[in-house]
């Protein structure tokens, strides 16, 4: 349906990262290969907070499959990291990273849904903080 409707963007990501749930992931990979998709978002692989060892190895396994799939596309094969902007600000610089931001409007100001909403930090401030690290 997607292709018949004329859509041309052949990149997959998902709300709430459901594409890394194994039951969805295993079916989705067949769809991606068989219908000409070019890339899929990585599972979050850099976090400033601790995650369980099981979750860590699971994400490594999933990302290994996603790196392999994405290696076919000139743009997405370069992406090595997927992380939140707070992780990016706290940790060392990462080349070739996709940074997750969830824009929302709060009191007329565009910010990130994970930002401290009492700090009046707008999305431009967040982007400027990130660009200072480059």
Task: Annotate each PLM feature.
Residues 15-19:
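Short, internal active-site loops enriched in acidic
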């Amino acid at each position: 349906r997607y292709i018949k409707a004329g859509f041309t963007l052949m990149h997959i990501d998902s709300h709430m990262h459901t594409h890394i749930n194994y039951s969805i992931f295993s079916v989705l990979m067949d769809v991606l290969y068989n219908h000409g998709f070019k890339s899929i978002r990585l599972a979050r692989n850099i976090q400033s907070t601790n995650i369980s060892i099981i979750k860590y190895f699971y994400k490594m396994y999933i990302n290994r499959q996603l790196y392999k799939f994405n290696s076919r596309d000139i743009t997405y094969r370069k992406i090595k990291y997927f992380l939140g902007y707070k992780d990016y600000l706290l940790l060392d610089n990462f080349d070739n990273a996709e940074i997750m931001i969830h824009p929302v409007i709060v009191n007329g100001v565009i910010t990130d849904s994970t930002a401290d909403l009492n700090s009046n930090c707008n999305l431009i401030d967040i982007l400027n903080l990130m660009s200072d690290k480059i």
